[in-house]
Amino acid sequence: MKRFGILSAMICSLLVPGLASSGAAREKYHDPGLKKVIQIAIVVRDIETASRRWAEVLGMPVPEIRTTRPGHEVKMTYRGRPSDGQAKLTFFNLGQVVLELIQPVGEGTSWKEILDKRGEGVHHLGFQVVDPDKASQSLEREGFPVIHKGRYDSDDGTYIYFDSQKSLGVLIEALHSDGRK
């Protein structure tokens, strides 16, 4: 039952503006600060093919595809251990939400793990957070441990994936931009 509390809070915060910021909601659900979905990410085996197809469906140009820096350069960890994993990424800006396509490169990432276990499909919902430590504490208290984290390639923020697959069917990502370079 506890695991459904956070899902209820997230759905309510999306559907009923102001509810999640009320004192009652914060107290009952430990308010992890997941107020705004900014990203839906899909893991794929072939990012070139997938990005062309998504561009056709969305009626948009194919965005640039880039390869992330090796994990050791961005302080990446996977399941608590340093990782040198990488990914090819592309982003479709859809207004208030970004569609991210991810093709894992190498081992040691949640991207590769989920692609191997479940095949192509939704990897995570990305939420913008103000306080990543608060989000981590709250989500871990809900039973969602950190599975994978690191810094942006631009070194001006962090991403943290929480293992919420079993009860929510998808990972939760907390995205925090700290503005430093």
Task: Name each model feature, range by range.
Residues 8-18:
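Bacterial N-terminal signal peptides
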Residues 20-25:
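Boundary at the C-terminal end of the N-terminal hydrophobic targeting segment
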Residues 46-61, 135-142:
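Amphipathic alpha-helical segments
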Residues 1-8:
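Bacterial N-terminal signal peptides that target proteins for export
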Residues 26-30, 37-45, 89-97, 114-131, 133-181:
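Vicinal oxygen chelate
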Residues 34:
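Catalytic phosphate/metal-binding cores of nucleic-acid and nucleotide-processing enzymes, i.e., regions
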Residues 67-80, 84, 107-115, 122, ...:
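A cross-kingdom feature marking solvent-exposed beta-strand/loop segments within repeated
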